[in-house]
């Protein structure tokens, strides 16, 4: 077993193999509290291109004190369909049964996303399998495409889940973030308007049956993640952070557990590089709580300041810094032009648009997709992320870090330019 010890710990879990061009991309990370186990997933590809994905690989890590012992890399051959490549891992832990559900898409052969968008012919299947022993063994794959999407698929040019973790709400609902390219009109045999929109797949019966939520509109949104945060008088609100091509991150809120979202808004504190990039978000209850926050001019921001993103039903209680001490933690490249310098941001008042901190830089240099996990009750977080010396697809690293390190950037002004 490979051991990573003490805090702010870093280890390479998946390394590009230069001789045979094997590349690992699209990280997904899950922490399972009862067994103190991490599951780290990635796509194995024969090149960096999306259409050269083959199957998923994973590693199991066990927390021992403030260290993680990692087992060997394993191919997840159970997560395959004949004649398809497996992509976009999205795991979620169901606390009542102890099952780990792993969602993914299986895409026909080497059919590219561009081809699907050009012809309006979806080549992806919505699939999942589950483990009842924290990833030691896996069941058979199940194709949910017809059951969950059905006839609506004729309006989808293509789609994907995640990538990165899903969540279970306090109500028990399981949520798998996703996005689809919607075809709004055709000209002869070609779709003339195809735009991506985020949505949720969900289950209210512990994963027995699954359903499709409504699209986040009208803003173009893609790869996304969600986190549950407190709203008014115990009302729980779902926060969604979504990729856009429009220079800034899109944020949207749901008051019905992810079936429907309000109109998304671009947050100008959270930049996107050219073309956008996937990012990760989690909710957490930090062990250390600062009492004030500053705006961009350096003045204290009142804790009761209302967020222009939300309607009156989402307002937090009077006097709340975060009403129950729940924060958001967000990982994303911080450079406005390129996928560089992976940052960790926090928001101590999740429904307030102006409360995002400056980023604490987790990785300097090329940085791509990432996925966050919370080690509950220990003030620790984990991040699985793409990085490298020259390109962000050279390796996928795991880092364990503390809330104290994130809070070292303890003001809430806008991120500086990169």
Curated annotation (Swiss-Prot):
GO terms for cellular component: caveola; cytoplasm; early endosome membrane; external side of plasma membrane; lysosomal membrane; lysosome; membrane; plasma membrane. Its EC number is 3.2.1.18. InterPro entries: Sialidase (IPR011040), Sialidase_fam (IPR026856), Sialidase_sf (IPR036278). The keyword Hydrolase applies. Keywords: Carbohydrate metabolism, Cell membrane, Endosome, Glycosidase, Hydrolase, Lipid degradation, Lipid metabolism, Lipoprotein, Lysosome, Membrane, Repeat. Palmitoylated; may regulate intracellular trafficking and anchorage to plasma membrane and endomembranes. One of its GO terms (molecular function) is alpha-sialidase activity. Substrate binds at residues 25, 45, 179, 181, 223, 243, 339. A motif (FRIP motif) lies at residues 24-27. It is a peripheral membrane protein. It is found in: Cell membrane; Membrane, Caveola; Early endosome membrane; Recycling endosome membrane. GO terms for biological process: carbohydrate metabolic process; ganglioside catabolic process; negative regulation of clathrin-dependent endocytosis; oligosaccharide catabolic process; positive regulation of epidermal growth factor receptor signaling pathway. It catalyses: Hydrolysis of alpha-(2->3)-, alpha-(2->6)-, alpha-(2->8)- glycosidic linkages of terminal sialic acid residues in oligosaccharides, glycoproteins, glycolipids, colominic acid and synthetic substrates; a ganglioside GD1a + H2O = a ganglioside GM1 + N-acetylneuraminate; a ganglioside GD1a (d18:1(4E)) + H2O = a ganglioside GM1 (d18:1(4E)) + N-acetylneuraminate; a ganglioside GD1b + H2O = a ganglioside GM1 + N-acetylneuraminate. Pfam families: BNR_2. Disulfide bonds: none annotated. The active site is at 50 (proton acceptor), 369 (nucleophile), 386. Its main location: membrane. Expressed in brain, cardiac muscle and weakly in liver. BNR repeats lie at residues 129-140, 201-212, 252-263. Coiled coil: none annotated. Belongs to the glycosyl hydrolase 33 family. Exo-alpha-sialidase that catalyzes the hydrolytic cleavage of the terminal sialic acid (N-acetylneuraminic acid, Neu5Ac) of a glycan moiety in the catabolism of glycolipids, glycoproteins and oligosacharides. Displays high catalytic efficiency for gangliosides including alpha-(2->3)-sialylated GD1a and GM3 and alpha-(2->8)-sialylated GD3. Plays a role in the regulation of transmembrane signaling through the modulation of ganglioside content of the lipid bilayer and by direct interaction with signaling receptors, such as EGFR. Interacts with CAV1; this interaction enhances NEU3 sialidase activity within caveola. Interacts with EGFR; this interaction mediates desialylation of EGFR enhancing downstream signaling. This is Sialidase-3.
């Amino acid at each position: 077993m490979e051991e990573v010890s003490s805090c702010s710990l870093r280890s390479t879990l998946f390394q590009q193999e230069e001789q045979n061009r094997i590349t690992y991309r699209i990280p997904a990370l899950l922490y399972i509290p009862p067994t103190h186990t991490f599951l780290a997933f990635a796509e194995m590809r024969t090149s960096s291109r999306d259409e050269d994905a083959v199957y998923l690989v994973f590693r199991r890590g066990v927390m021992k004190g403030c260290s993680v012992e990692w087992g060997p890399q394993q191919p997840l051959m159970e997560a395959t369909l004949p004649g398809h490549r497996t992509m976009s891992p999205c795991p979620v832990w169901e606390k009542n049964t102890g099952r780990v559900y792993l969602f993914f898409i299986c895409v026909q052969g080497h059919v590219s996303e561009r081809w699907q968008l050009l012809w309006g012919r979806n080549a992806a299947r919505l699939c999942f399998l589950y483990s009842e022993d924290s990833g030691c063994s896996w069941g058979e794959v199940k194709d949910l495409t017809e059951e969950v999407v059905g006839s609506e698929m004729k309006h989808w040019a293509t789609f994907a889940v995640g990538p990165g973790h899903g969540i279970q709400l306090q109500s028990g609902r399981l949520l798998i973030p996703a996005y689809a390219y919607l075809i709004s009109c055709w000209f002869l045999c070609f779709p003339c308007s195809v735009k991506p929109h985020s949505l949720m797949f969900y289950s209210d019966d512990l994963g027995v049956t699954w359903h499709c939520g409504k699209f986040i509109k009208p803003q173009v949104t893609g790869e996304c993640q969600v986190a549950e945060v407190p709203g008014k008088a115990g009302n729980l609100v779902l926060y969604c952070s979504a990729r856009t091509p429009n220079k800034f991150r899109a944020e949207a809120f749901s008051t019905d557990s992810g079936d429907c979202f309000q109109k998304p808004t671009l947050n100008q504190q959270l930049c996107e590089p050219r073309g956008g990039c996937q990012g990760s978000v989690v909710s957490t209850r930090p062990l250390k709580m600062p009492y004030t926050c500053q705006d961009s001019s350096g003045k204290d921001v009142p804790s009761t300041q209302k967020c222009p993103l939300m309607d009156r039903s989402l307002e937090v209680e009077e006097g709340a810094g975060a009403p129950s001490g729940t924060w958001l933690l967000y990982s994303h490249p911080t450079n406005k032009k390129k996928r560089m310098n992976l940052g960790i941001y926090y928001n101590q008042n999740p429904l307030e648009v102006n409360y995002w901190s400056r980023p604490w830089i987790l990785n300097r240099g090329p940085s791509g997709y990432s996925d966050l996990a919370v080690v509950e009750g220990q003030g620790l977080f984990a991040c699985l992320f793409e990085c490298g010396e020259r390109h962000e697809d050279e390796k996928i690293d795991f880092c364990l870090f503390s809330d104290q390190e994130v809070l070292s950037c303890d003001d809430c002004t806008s991120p500086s330019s990169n």
